[in-house]
């Protein structure tokens, strides 16, 4: 039985990769990488996101200046059709991932009831 669980996990991984929503994220990501300005904005977003997550993990909040930078970056991203499409595709994929997470972790949740 223990090997079966890994087979199921690998099957799930392949199924996620086959989802049209996953394929759309890949497609849009490739388009972003092919566009220098979109790629630069995406890299700025990732760097900003990592910085904010690090701050929050250490109990800090973004300063007013950092919040302004975040808003400005968000506006630039919203104005870029490729990045906008990427985040929309990510959102569609995240619906599946949230549902899968809920299903997979249900047995563990039962253990703490």
Swiss-Prot record:
InterPro entries: Com_YlbF (IPR010368), YheA/YmcA-like_dom_sf (IPR023378). Disulfide bonds: none annotated. It comes from the Bacteria. Pfam families: Com_YlbF. Belongs to the UPF0342 family. This is UPF0342 protein M6_Spy0643. It comes from Streptococcus pyogenes serotype M6 (strain ATCC BAA-946 / MGAS10394).
């Amino acid at each position: 039985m223990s090997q079966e669980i890994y087979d199921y996990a690998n099957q799930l991984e392949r199924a996620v990769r086959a989802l049209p929503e996953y394929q759309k994220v890949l497609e849009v990501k490739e388009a972003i990488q092919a566009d220098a300005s979109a790629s630069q904005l995406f890299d700025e977003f990732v760097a900003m996101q990592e910085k904010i997550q690090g701050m929050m993990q250490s109990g800090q909040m973004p300063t007013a200046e950092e919040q302004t930078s975040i808003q400005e970056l968000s506006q630039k991203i919203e104005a870029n059709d490729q990045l906008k499409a990427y985040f929309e595709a990510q959102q569609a994929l995240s619906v599946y991932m949230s549902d899968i997470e809920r299903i997979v972790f249900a047995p563990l949740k039962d253990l703490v009831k």
